[in-house]
Amino acid sequence: KLYKMKKFLAILFVGVLFSALNFNNSEANTLTIKKNRVIKTKGDVFYKWPHNWKFSYIMEHWKPYAIQEITDNVRYGKTALRFELRSGSCGKTAGSDDCKNGPFGSERYELLPNNNDKDITFKGNVWHTISWYIEKFNTPLAGHNSIWQIHNDGDWAPMFNTDLMFDGLYWQRRTACNVPDIYKKYNAKGNDGCSVSWKENANVKIMDRNEIFDKWNDVIMNVNYTSKDNGFLKMWINGKLVYHYQGPVKPPNKGKGWSNNSTMQFGIYRMAEDGVHPHTQINYYDEIRYAKKKCSKLKLEQLGYSCEKLESQKIEVDTLFN
């Protein structure tokens, strides 16, 4: 009887321990998502951000591991977001099918502005930040791989996006694709016919490969969101000014289908030229902060930066007509 009792207690202990572990795993993720794709977080990933976020695909493509709010790898504070994109994870958005994007499709787990019920756009002089951490991976395939973008919700070209290449991280500017006097020369308009290779666009390397993986990287941006020539974008990475653009940022507003509502979106968006990416990619994001006009409102001293030192830096300016 004593042996049976010990055996029973041992089995009971293992069962309780297993249940506790499962409970902790399920409780570790504090992100929830509604049927309308809108997410809700409980932690401190976002600071003063002016709008909510929604998942990039329709809900039939949602996976519990796709985007989680976690506590075990954070840049600052208590929580960060963990994105996990597995091979073959293409899907449908509200108006398109990434599985039919190119010969092998594209894959996208991103967070977009929640514009289900209202227009969302940034206007004028804005400061915003995003910190990211990418687990190291290797892929034999060429293509594109975006970490975050400055985008619009019309058919215009994305104005700015990152591209993670084999040798490092590139910042791609396509603002020329949204300027009528320029895109008409190429018999193009917006995303239709746009190419980063146009002489009026730019593709600038901003980080070497050995600076990217398995560490937190902090991005600070100061953007004047306007379609006028006095627009600009300055970007610092880990406290160093790496890019400065002067010129229109937002596209013109051409009405239905050609809205120029523009903000930041982030997550994993990738496409390979000669196959489907074979690897699982894991990105973390944290410290997504927003302020109007003044750097000081971002409280960057919490992350170890001085607005005065940031704003004193200079770099060659990129324009439409360099």
Region locations from a protein language model:
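N-terminal leader/targeting segments
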Residues: 1, 15-16, 319
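Sec/Tat signal peptide C-region and signal peptidase I cleavage site
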Residues: 22-28
